[in-house]
Amino acid sequence: MVNPGIRAATRRLRVAVILLYAWMPHAWADSIDDRLAPCLACHGEKGQSNIPEVPSLGAQTSPYVLIQLYLFREKLRRFEIMNEAVKGFTDDDLRTFADAISKLPAPPPTTDTTDPARMVRGQALVRQHRCNVCHSPDLAGRDAVPRIAGQREDFLVKTMREYKGNIRAGYDASMGDVMQPIPDADILDLAYFTARQP
């Protein structure tokens, strides 16, 4: 478990770095790779996050990223770091970032499969709750539906709990509705299985 003081200090440092980049004029960067640098400071090199509860972005669908960036910019989805990071972005900026993020490599799945029973339960739950209908059969997402395969397990748990608790804002209510009847034990198994998919 991460020391709460260290977690708070790390969060403040990340906020400071992102705010520094967000307040600088767009002319500071020569390329999209340069402009993505502050994003990857938190979301990880090549979009593969190593920070607890911070999602990996690699191979995320461009329409989904565009919608999320828009929600952050308009403060329809509230998370201070992200709201500040994109507040000055134009619609073209949002599209450019969404396209660039979608071209990052997919994160490798978690390889620790020490609990085969949880894998079996998780796979059955994916079918039972039809996650593979919207998120695609391989959970790689499509169109405005996000890639969840290989995503950080802790982020998946956090996100599903937020949808279940009607805390997570979205552009429609479908995930909140889907998550309502799912008990926490099933959320843990769903996340365990999904994080280990390529």
Report each predicted region and the residues it spans.
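Sequence/structural segment immediately N-terminal to covalent heme-attachment motifs in c-type
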Residues: W28-Q48, P109-T110, T114-P137, R152
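N-terminal secretory signal peptides that target proteins for export/translocation
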Residues: M1-R11
